[in-house]
């Protein structure tokens, strides 16, 4: 086994041989072409030192840890109040729940998902490494590639669908500024899946959002603050407008349309959906918590996630019910409501509503999708990609190559597949949490970068305990996933009901099996007496027991 303290301790596991595949002597490409291509690749290499260390895969140094507890609050509060988040509560009402029941499902789901997000987030706040590197400890030095690919695929497609929502924001702005834009002539064929005016809106959104993806994640906290404040102001303004027109009792007195045993399973399905909505973040939350100043900062997620659901979900529910009364159609999207404001004053309000949600969608897409997908992508190409280059690739592929408007228009089966990815990400989150308890949160930061170290487990770089736990958790849910993708497939009620609680089942099953296997067959080399951490920041060197009064209060707020 290699010495983890050697000069190669921060090698990320991609060898020179692996990086140069196709350029060896066995290559059939002629020498001139090979030479030009090799020269081109050489120019693309990052200038990160003689050892080709990628700083975005290395532990975040103290001088790049800028996030405080308030910044984490801004980060997640801006997600819960976005335009896409508003649709969730109303979709549960369409399933048959009453407004109060839909709200209860959302809050309960956020309470549950806050636990794995906090526990996995603590890994990032202590060891300051991205999810892609962290996963080596649980799945093995090479088997973690499976989970990274799943997360990358999810982030790529979710980015594209969110760009579509961002385009709706731009469309609302253009409708408000240019009255004639509503009747803009469509010059695209019907099978294009998109109209000319919306394609313009789509392109404008992508161009506006592009520069924000060039900002390194550790410097985005002020952007999240601005977004949170502006969006909450806009949301409460719309809430007041709707309630003044229809009254609060009309909204909350709506009855459920299902009852008995059917209601129970509909409620469980809604509860599972509210949890699964955060399934990607529960896996890769440390892509952001790696930038926090203090190791205890992620604990604020236990409070902020349920609180955001309790504040934002009622606004979406009110929008759906009130819009049906006012306009004759239930509009679960605040942008659709704003598009009905056609008077001079109404268009001004619609402009500010669209602008607010435009900023909101840019922030949400960064925090939910592009940073995570970029971290996953640069993991495979560490010599050539940093977080900025990787984000540029993600936003080009996600916005244009996968053609998200086609998916949203005709891709019902594919959207069902995207929604079912939580049955694979749930086991990953469960295994991460179980691994944290199994190791008593003691890891060796150097070993994460040692290809022959303790987190390799065997010659294959595979932790078989994680493989068994993963398969036991997700395989029983695959028939239900197949049914959701292709409704013509018939399944027994038991299979359907198991799929309705898929995230709960997959998370808990993976957690218990992985925990049990490690009790019976422990990987003793990974059980450390003392943890090995990266260098500590100034915040970590302060002993809060020596502080009192307002100094202690601001210590926890600022750090």
From Swiss-Prot:
Family per record: Belongs to the purine-cytosine permease (2.A.39) family.
InterPro entries membership: Pur-cyt_permease, Uracil/uridine/allantoin_perm
Parts of the chain that traverse the membrane: 103-123, 139-159, 192-212, 223-243, 263-283, 302-322, 348-368, 387-407, 413-434, 466-486, 501-521
GO MF: nucleobase transmembrane transporter activity
Compartment(s) of residence: Golgi apparatus membrane
UniProt entry keywords in alphabetical sequence: Golgi apparatus, Membrane, Transmembrane, Transmembrane helix
Protein name per UniProt: Uncharacterized permease C1683.05
Annotated membrane topology: Multi-pass membrane protein
Cellular component aspect of the GO annotation: Golgi membrane; plasma membrane
A single BP term in Gene Ontology: nucleobase transport
């Amino acid at each position: 086994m290699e010495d983890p303290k050697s000069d190669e301790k921060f090698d990320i596991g991609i060898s020179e041989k692996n990086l140069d595949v196709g350029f060896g002597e066995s290559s059939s490409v002629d020498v001139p072409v090979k030479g030009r291509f090799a020269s081109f690749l050489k120019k693309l290499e990052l200038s990160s030192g003689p050892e080709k260390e990628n700083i975005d895969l290395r532990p975040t140094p103290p001088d790049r840890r800028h996030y405080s507890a308030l910044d984490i609050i801004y980060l997640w509060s801006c997600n819960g109040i976005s335009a896409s988040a508003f649709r969730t509560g109303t979709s549960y009402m369409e399933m048959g729940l009453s407004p109060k029941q839909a709200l209860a499902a959302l809050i309960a789901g956020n309470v549950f998902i806050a636990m794995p997000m906090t526990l996995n987030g603590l890994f990032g706040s202590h060891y300051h490494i991205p999810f892609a590197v962290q996963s080596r400890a649980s799945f093995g030095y090479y088997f973690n590639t499976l989970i990274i690919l799943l997360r990358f695929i999810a982030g790529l497609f979710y980015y594209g669908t969110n760009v579509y929502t961002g385009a709706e924001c731009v469309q609302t702005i253009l409708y408000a500024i240019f009255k004639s834009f509503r009747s803009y002539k469509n010059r695209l064929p019907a099978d294009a899946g998109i109209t000319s005016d919306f394609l313009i809106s789509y392109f404008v959104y992508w161009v506006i959002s592009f520069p924000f993806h060039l900002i390194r994640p550790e410097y985005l906290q002020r952007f999240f603050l601005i977004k949170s404040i502006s969006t909450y102001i806009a949301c409460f303004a719309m809430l007041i407008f709707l309630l003044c027109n229809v009254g609060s009792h009309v909204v909350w007195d709506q009855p459920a349309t299902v009852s008995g045993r059917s209601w129970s399973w509909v409620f469980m399905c809604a509860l599972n959906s509210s949890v699964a909505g955060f399934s990607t973040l529960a896996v890769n939350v440390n892509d952001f918590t790696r930038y926090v100043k203090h190791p205890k900062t992620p604990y604020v997620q236990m409070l902020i996630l349920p609180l955001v659901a309790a504040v934002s979900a009622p606004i979406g529910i009110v929008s759906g019910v009130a819009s049906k009364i006012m306009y004759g159609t239930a509009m679960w999207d605040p942008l659709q409501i704003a598009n009905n404001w056609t008077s001079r004053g109404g268009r001004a309000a619609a402009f500010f509503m669209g602008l607010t949600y435009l900023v909101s969608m840019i922030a949400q897409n960064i925090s939910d999708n592009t940073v995570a997908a970029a971290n996953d992508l640069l993991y495979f190409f560490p010599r050539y990609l940093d977080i900025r280059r990787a984000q540029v690739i993600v936003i080009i592929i996600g916005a244009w190559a996968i053609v998200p408007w086609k998916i949203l228009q005709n891709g019902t089966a594919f959207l069902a597949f995207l929604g079912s990815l939580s049955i694979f990400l749930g086991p990953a989150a469960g295994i991460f949490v179980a691994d944290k308890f199994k190791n008593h949160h003691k890891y060796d930061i150097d070993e994460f970068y040692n290809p022959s170290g303790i987190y390799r487990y065997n010659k294959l770089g595979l932790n078989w305990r994680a493989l068994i736990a993963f398969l036991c958790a997700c395989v029983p849910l695959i028939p239900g996933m197949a049914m959701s993708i292709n409704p013509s497939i018939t399944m027994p009620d038991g299979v359907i009901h198991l799929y309705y609680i898929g995230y709960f089942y997959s998370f808990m099953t993976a957690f218990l099996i992985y925990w049990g296997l490690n009790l019976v067959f422990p990987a003793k080399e990974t059980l450390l007496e003392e943890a090995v951490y990266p260098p500590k920041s100034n915040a970590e060197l302060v002993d809060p027991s020596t502080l009192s009064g307002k100094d202690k209060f601001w210590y926890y707020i600022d750090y």
